[in-house]
Amino acid sequence: MHSAWNAFAWRGCMKHNEKNFQLYRKEELFMDLKGTKINFLGDSITEGAGTSCVEARFTTLMKEIAGVAEIRNYGIGGTRIARQQTVTNEQFDKNDYCTRFSAMDDDADVIVVFGGTNDYGHGDAPFGTFSDRTPETFCGAVHYLFRGLIEKYPTKPIVVITPLHRENDTVPNALHGKTLKDYVDVIREGAEMYSLPVLDLFASFGVCPDIPAQKAAYCPDGLHPNDAGNRKIAEKLKTFLEAL
């Protein structure tokens, strides 16, 4: 009787502790985005190309679906991560990510970096090798950018979003003979090296623009997500950030 009661009490204690542990873990693992400020560094997709209005951008939608207090949108259409060899007065030529990340506001709670598709699409910087540390090659620019962001925001979550699939992205680019996946792989590897969390939309966005029905539904021009595509990004980003 005594031992049976002890066993019962032990099981009850374990259940109680397990419940408390689960609640503790849930609180520990859940990031409350309400009231936060997020810096978004990106290209035309971040800027909102393809959407019908500002409110339909995935960045702005984070206010609606996650309660984010302030969105700082540093998206500039056409920009690349790496510096260009031929620089013009066009914004997309002179404002690569490595050049402009340092000008972002310092007081962000979360930083989100979303780029690489333009490096594949029309960037003239050499692809380089993973040992590069210069912003003049794509591989080097990934290192330069990630390390620079960590130094600027040493205690804040820095999230990397891979490029989305785009139409015909298995075709090697003319200058370097690289597919979009080659660029994505460098971004993944660089993020892993610096222990930055990756929202891998190349692998898990669920949209392949080479399939006409999905292209029509989510990115009619084969590259820029429409309103439905932006909401899909926002929902995935919310879930990802909350789990950090």
Stretches with model-predicted labels:
Residues 93-244:
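Alpha-helical cap/lid subdomain in secreted, periplasmic
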Residues 32-39, 45-140:
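Conserved SGNH/GDSL esterase-like catalytic core that processes O-acyl groups on lipids
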